[in-house]
């Protein structure tokens, strides 16, 4: 049979309790206050208005079609129009055409920040300070970015594909926007992303959102569980193949008789 095992993440690099880039670290017991401080730091870093009540949507990654960035670039202006207090920050590099589009989006609104470069500190600021992390990938064998987000109590908004389906539970640890068309940019996909993000924005600050964030950060997303599954699968494969079993050696009768003479 086929066994699917999702990735784990490195808690030594991605851990809000020990993150060297955060002025105020936090854990599952202090996630509400910690994320509020991280949001303020993120807004100041990328030039967004300092507004604690604004739902902040983030994206970190390559700017390319596989990651659904063309969908996101079309969706963001609609989202900002539909949700007047929402803020968006996008960090990434990739296709030159998409980098230029992101530079244009950066000038679209004071509530939109586009950072066209790689920055590890800003990646950590977004992971901690955003309220939602957008992952609109057309395909994603497993993905790590959604695990990083949940580790920090940031709720992922994901396309329903690959490992994103396995790691993000609708209404429990995130929002699903449905599967994206793999063959090109479709208006229905853009609308699905806008609608899902708008629904998340409407839920922001509610008890349901607070519970979702707490559920995210309360998970063990390290390699401990995946490693145990790998070990169990490999042991089963070895057993089924007969590897390591003692082989019974039967000596032919004529050889035994010959040995007596």
Region locations from a protein language model:
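Catalytic cores of carbohydrate-active enzymes across secretory and cytosolic contexts
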Residues: 1-261
């Amino acid at each position: 049979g086929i066994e699917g095992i999702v990735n784990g993440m490195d808690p030594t690099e991605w851990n809000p309790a020990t993150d060297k880039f955060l002025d105020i670290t936090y854990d599952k017991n202090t996630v509400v206050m910690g994320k509020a401080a991280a949001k303020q730091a993120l807004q100041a870093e990328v030039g967004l208005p300092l507004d604690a009540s604004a739902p902040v949507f983030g994206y970190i990654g390559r700017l390319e079609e596989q990651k659904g960035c063309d969908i996101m670039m079309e969706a963001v202006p609609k989202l900002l129009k539909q949700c007047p207090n929402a803020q968006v920050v996008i960090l990434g590099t990739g296709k030159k055409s998409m980098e230029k589009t992101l530079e244009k989006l950066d000038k679209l609104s004071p509530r939109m920040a586009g950072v066209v470069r790689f920055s590890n500190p800003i990646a950590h600021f977004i992971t901690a300070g955003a309220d939602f992390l957008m992952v609109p990938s057309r395909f994603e064998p497993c993905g790590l970015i959604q695990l990083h987000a949940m580790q920090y109590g940031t709720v992922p908004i994901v396309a329903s594909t690959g490992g994103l389906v396995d790691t993000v539970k609708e209404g429990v640890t995130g929002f699903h926007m449905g599967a994206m068309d793999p063959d090109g940019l479709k208006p229905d996909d853009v609308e699905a992303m806008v609608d899902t993000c708008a629904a998340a924005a409407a839920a922001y600050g509610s008890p349901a959102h607070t519970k979702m964030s707490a559920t995210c950060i309360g998970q063990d997303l390290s390699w401990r569980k995946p490693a145990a599954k790998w070990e169990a699968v490999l042991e089963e494969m070895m057993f089924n193949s007969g590897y390591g079993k003692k082989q019974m050696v039967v000596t032919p009768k004529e050889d035994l008789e010959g040995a007596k003479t």
